Amino acid sequence: MSDAVSITGEFMPARLARQLLSIQAQNQQTTRLDGWFLIQEIRMHALQALRASETDHPNVIVQAKLFTAVCAQLTLTIRPDEIFAGTQDDAFARTYALINPEFRVETFAGYCDPMAVYGDITPAPELGLSAERIERVRDFWAHEPFAQALREAYAGTGAELAEVAYFTEQVTGHTVADFRPALQYGLLPLIDAARSGAQEHTGARRDFYLAAEIALHAALTIGDRYAHLAAEMAKEEADPIRKSELERIAYTAGCVLRRGATTLYEAMQAFILLWMAMALEQSPNPYAFSVGNLDRILQPYYEQHAIEREVAVELTRQLLALFNVGDRNWAISQNIMVGGRDVQGNDLTCAMTYIILNAFYRSNYPQPALSVKIHAGTPDAVYAALEPFFITPGSLTPSFFNDDVLFPLLARKGIAQQDWPLYAIAGCQEPLIMGKESENTTNSWLNLGKILELTLHGGKSAISGKRIGLSYEELGLDPQQPIRDMAQMKAAFWKQLDGLLPRMEAAANACTRAMALLPIPFLSCFMGGLDSGVDLRDVTAQGTPYNASGCLIHGLSVVADSLAAIHTLQQTSPEALAELPRALLANFDGVEALRQRCLSAPKYGNHLALPDQLAAEIVAGVSRRVYGLRNPWGNPFLPDWSTPSTHLLYGYWVGATPDGRLARQMLNYGIDPSAGMATHGLPPRMLSMHTLPYQEMLGGYASHLGLEPGMLQAAGERGFITALREFVIDPLFGFTGGTGGYYVYFNIDSAQHLREILARPKELVPSGIYIMRIHGTFVNFLDLSPAIQEDIITRLDAQSTRLVGKAQRA
């Protein structure tokens, strides 16, 4: 067969592979992302025109009309070699700090200022983007109600937010839409449902249904415009093969959103157009939109119209290219899942599971993230398909989620049994129900290290000296000797935390109410809105079946180890307790012997009774307190023990702590031991982690294992993945009996090798791409800032994951 694509729709794998290389090369040359600004400008003009018309529309309809203007006016392109129409590039700016080489822990201030994005666009007079034009748009939106509401939300937080005792933010993205009905039937039935809803309801619900109909029609406009563009390009195309490809794009883009898909190609094209519309609606920077089980979504179309497996792999690689935004993959933390089981324990692996895994392995790009659902009955063939990821240096390594533990956790959250298999990951590791759950996942962030510091110093910051928390007297401590024993300090810690949590709750809810000023009727149609008649962001009623707000909790092992150190000093050298507050304020300067005693105290991660019990107690106590907070819907905040590189940022604002950690050093990552503190090897580390109450971590948690490349090869000759299962996955997840966790990700490399790569990148990585993980997402190690590169190297922490370790109980 020739290297061609026929009018009837045959694809040639070799051509598809070459086209993908061309697309990736074009991405690498895309150093400007200006579409988001043009979207803001289109919205500005549309809003000004609406106001000039003197027609008073409800806000949800206003937002639908602004979305319509964007879909109708934004410039569309089909680049050379693209076989699908659609992009999410225009939704993102060159903003995400952790993949920006200019990122500095010392100066990062979060994403709470919606006007900060305008600092991420460089004026380009040759493109018509003058500084004056940028400022005009920025100034317009700075005076709109949303920006004003956010400023008011942050106005009362002061030093407690500036020094991150807690942090709050408005949440965009971080959602898993259910596009399956639109893929199968098209948008016309949804439009009919919206129209019927408007006829059957009055008031706010009628307004929503009217807005939904407008927004769904706007998405059809995108498909129609691409169809027209592709048809016009086909008329001018001399190459018959490319002409045929453009004609296919024109035909499919023009009809698939109306009638639904019947082939794998059509399903992918429909998905891309829907994804584009969803991203445009929340531009700029809707981070962590995620897909769910892509294998289950696409399997019906693979079965319905048979194609060669190799063609399916290459088409999937083309689909994955949607998630590669610009030269640094700026659309961060977009997650795709495969695998898993149903509620009866039956494995749900299908042909598309293996096709998607193969596509990811061949492409090996920083985005999107890949997560694999596993369980005790996961087939050996799935593990065999995963092995290449783990034995290839610089290859992405999927994260694992344990259905056997997650299903009971979902039950505790109040999720109906039939919805358990629908859980998906919104971004890094937060489990949500596809199409049914709005969790506002990154709404609040809690810094236990700072809470401990404020407790130790009577409410004053060890960094700035500012009064932030409760005083010694309010905590019931003696100002002359506040640290007398562990029990007293622990009680004071809880009291300090209880004093700050209501303030965090209020600030987080203010951000959520601000977001309600920007309804998203298009996405809401795929999140239960057509059933409820309520926008996903509406705080006056609940639009999704499941709703919560998130709280990401930092500093578990720092606090546990610090309390253990206080207890150890109490037992061995009680006179040192009187000296400890001054030593901490001095960053242990001049008292190195005291610091060494603190460092030598028992540490979480070594299977030692005291710190392990303290860690479990902290998880339970903090989680229950966070769960007791309420969002604007009256639903709980879900405790999420995840620290998406923020363990660096939050540690920078924490002074020295009794575990021996110096001021401004990073906190521990997620639920992992502090770097360098788990010295007894992997088995004791896992035993420590088994003591944690995972069922209290209703919002998720983060955990990372850094493995030396040769470690598991030395464990046996049965293959790397077999050894990984036997020595790591099965015991960690409880597949061999006992309790277990439900999430882990790996980096398989050595600190020495990564430092060599940094020293000689062109020689050792000629492709310029070397994939590692930071929290729940892949990154190109060479694109990162020095601070993040060093964090990855430090947390490989080989001594904590060596297989031969002594387990002991103190």
Q: Could you tell me what each predicted segment is?
A:
Residues 2-212, 241-809:
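Conserved catalytic cores of very large enzyme subunits
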Residues 210-221:
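Extended non-globular scaffold/tether segments
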Residues 223-231, 295-299:
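Extended amphipathic alpha-helical scaffold segments
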Residues 230-246:
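Short, Lys/Glu-rich amphipathic helical modules
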